[in-house]
């Protein structure tokens, strides 16, 4: 009996060993073919002696706490080149700002890289079925809820909604004194986007904001703050309590789900009663993103997560764009004067139309340049889901390919690619909107809204929203004067901003 059992165990182990050997051989063959086909060579390595990657973690954490993470990124690329390898907790990680590699990861070899493992743990608690928390078929399904809607910006861009937001903003701007525009921009965009997304705004600029909406807005802000913190702490975030974070996520989800169910009930009632008219509140909801998504699905959780995704991603990106733009305009009087003259000459002092905004060429240059100098998302990451490669960065001269093993992470830095003198000239660190006259950004690693299949679907809507607010402010105020002598200091959240805000005086 024991002999038969021993023979069976031996046979099983033998077969297992053979399978392992065959798989190992096949993997070596695949890797060999990749190396030969793309001339792969090892890139330069940051601290090759730091085998466990502990020094890297210490250094990165120190720079993050000292608010010098971005200057450190620039220094590392200057030292090791546009692509280099490092180790973080024994894992080999690749950093790149080479436009060729960025396009490769986001576009050419999109299917070789996943995003969810990088950020799913951040977004899943608040949008478990949203596009930032999933990959593959589930990602395609979640993204499809937005695709057709955002492809028709003229149809969904509500000019009156934008004007209402501006009127709420203007009431908060004092005459004859300095003020920080950054928190006002955040409130403006949150109010407009929540009204667009749900048909009912969170009213953060209003004096009579309800307690419920105040709690939801605060919960949303807190959740985003913790998501940003945990994103930069990486695995270390598990050492910190997330109890309050989870509670904030539930507050946001519960409120949005209540709005979703209310709209679904109203739809069903109108369908059954054949009601010809609706009240003002319902009319607003029928024009909202929520209502348009409900035209495609009745999955409550999918709709809820789609709406919450807009509240998270859409709010921070537009608020960051506005704050960065006005920070720079306050320090470049010539640009502000030129932009104001274009607006007055082509639009006048009346609220702009959709076509007015689309034709504001110099304004688009200003936004492009602001997002180039201070990228909204200074770095991002993808994880290889198979053995693959990068087209550049290997070898002594950095012109060979780089082998990327399955499970290894590639971190690409728009902070580096947007500020590259090779792409944007010797004055790449200067704010000069005129550089965009005739400049094609496709091959320059310019990715303020990402690129490829994961490109931001709402980028045109975001630009329209930021444009409307900017035009109305510049129409109203003759001058924008800087009132802050402090240098720009990084504040890395879900989007990049200046820690010191936008302290200015707006002069009629």
From Swiss-Prot:
PANTHER family: P450, PUTATIVE (EUROFUNG)-RELATED. The keyword DNA repair does not apply. Keywords: Glycoprotein, Heme, Iron, Membrane, Metal-binding, Monooxygenase, Oxidoreductase, Transmembrane, Transmembrane helix. It is an enzyme of class 1 (oxidoreductase). It is found in: Membrane. Signal peptide: none annotated. GO terms for biological process: small molecule biosynthetic process. This is Cytochrome P450 monooxygenase afumB. Glycans are attached at residues 66, 72, 495. GO terms for molecular function: heme binding; iron ion binding; monooxygenase activity; oxidoreductase activity, acting on paired donors, with incorporation or reduction of molecular oxygen. Belongs to the cytochrome P450 family. It comes from Aspergillus fumigatus (strain CBS 144.89 / FGSC A1163 / CEA10). It is a single-pass membrane protein. Its cofactor is heme. Its EC number is 1.-.-.-. The chain crosses the membrane at residues 5-27. One of its GO terms (cellular component) is membrane. The keyword Transport does not apply. Pfam families: p450. Pathway: Secondary metabolite biosynthesis. InterPro entries: Cyt_P450 (IPR001128), Cyt_P450_CS (IPR017972), Cyt_P450_E_CYP52_fungi (IPR047146), Cyt_P450_E_grp-I (IPR002401), Cyt_P450_sf (IPR036396). Cytochrome P450 monooxygenase; part of the gene cluster that mediates the biosynthesis fumihopaside A, a hopane-type glucoside that enhances the thermotolerance and UV resistance of N.fumigata. The first step of fumihopaside A biosynthesis is performed by the squalene hopane cyclase afumA that catalyzes the cyclization of 3S-oxidosqualene into the hopene 21-beta-H-hopane-3-beta,22-diol. Disruption phenotype: Fails to produce fumihopaside A, but leads to the accumulation of 21-beta-H-hopane-3-beta,22-diol. CDD domains: CYP52 (cd11063).
């Amino acid at each position: 009996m024991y002999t038969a059992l021993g023979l069976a165990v031996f046979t099983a182990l033998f077969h297992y060993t053979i399978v392992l050997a065959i798989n190992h051989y096949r993997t070596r063959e695949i890797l060999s073919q990749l190396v030969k086909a793309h001339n792969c060579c090892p890139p330069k390595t940051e601290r090759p002696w730091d085998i466990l990657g502990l020094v890297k973690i210490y250094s990165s954490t120190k720079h993050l706490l000292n608010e010098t993470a971005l200057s450190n990124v620039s220094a590392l690329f200057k030292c090791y080149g546009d692509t280099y390898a490092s180790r973080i907790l024994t894992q080999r990680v690749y950093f790149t700002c080479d436009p060729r590699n960025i396009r490769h990861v986001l576009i050419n070899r999109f299917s070789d890289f996943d995003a969810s493992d990088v950020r799913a743990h951040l977004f899943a608690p608040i949008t478990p079925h949203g596009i930032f928390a999933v990959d593959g078929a589930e990602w395609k399904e979640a993204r499809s809820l937005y695709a057709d809607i955002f492809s028709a910006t003229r149809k969904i861009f509500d000019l009156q909604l934008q004007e209402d937001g501006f009127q709420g903003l203007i009431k908060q701007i004092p005459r004859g004194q300095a003020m920080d525009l950054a928190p006002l921009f955040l409130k403006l965009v949150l109010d407009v986007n929540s009204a667009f997304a749900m048909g009912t705004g969170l009213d953060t600029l209003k004096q009579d904001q309800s307690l419920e909406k105040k709690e939801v807005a605060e919960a949303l802000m807190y959740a985003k703050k913790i998501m940003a913190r945990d994103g930069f702490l990486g695995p270390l975030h598990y050492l910190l309590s997330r109890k309050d974070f989870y509670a904030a996520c539930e507050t946001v989800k519960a409120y949005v789900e209540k709005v979703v169910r209310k709209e679904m009930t109203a739809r069903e009632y109108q369908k059954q009663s054949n009601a010809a008219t609706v009240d003002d509140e319902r009319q607003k909801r029928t024009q909202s993103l929520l209502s348009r998504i409900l035209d495609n699905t009745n999955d409550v959780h999918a709709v809820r997560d789609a709406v919450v995704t807009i509240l998270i991603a859409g709010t921070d990106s537009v608020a960051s764009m506005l704050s960065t733009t006005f920070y720079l305009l306050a320090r470049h009087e010539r640009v502000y004067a030129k932009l104001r003259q274009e607006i007055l000459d082509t639009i006048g002092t009346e609220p702009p139309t959709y076509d007015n905004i689309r034709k504001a060429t110099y304004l688009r240059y200003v936004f492009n340049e602001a997002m180039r100098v201070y990228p909204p998302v200074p770095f991002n990451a993808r994880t290889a889901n198979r053995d693959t490669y990068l087209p550049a960065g290997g070898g002594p001269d950095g012109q060979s390919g780089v082998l990327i093993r399955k499970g290894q992470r590639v971190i690409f830095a728009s902070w580096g690619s947007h500020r590259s003198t090779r792409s944007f000239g010797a004055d790449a660190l200067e704010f000069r909107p005129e550089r965009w006259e005739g400049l094609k950004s496709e091959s320059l690693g310019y990715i303020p809204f990402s690129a490829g299949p994961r490109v931001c679907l709402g980028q045109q809507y975001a630009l329209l929203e930021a444009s409307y607010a900017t035009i109305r402010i510049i129409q109203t105020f003759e001058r924008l004067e800087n009132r802050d002598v402090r240098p720009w200091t990084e504040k890395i959240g879900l989007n990049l901003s200046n820690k010191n805000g936008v302290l200015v005086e707006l002069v009629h």
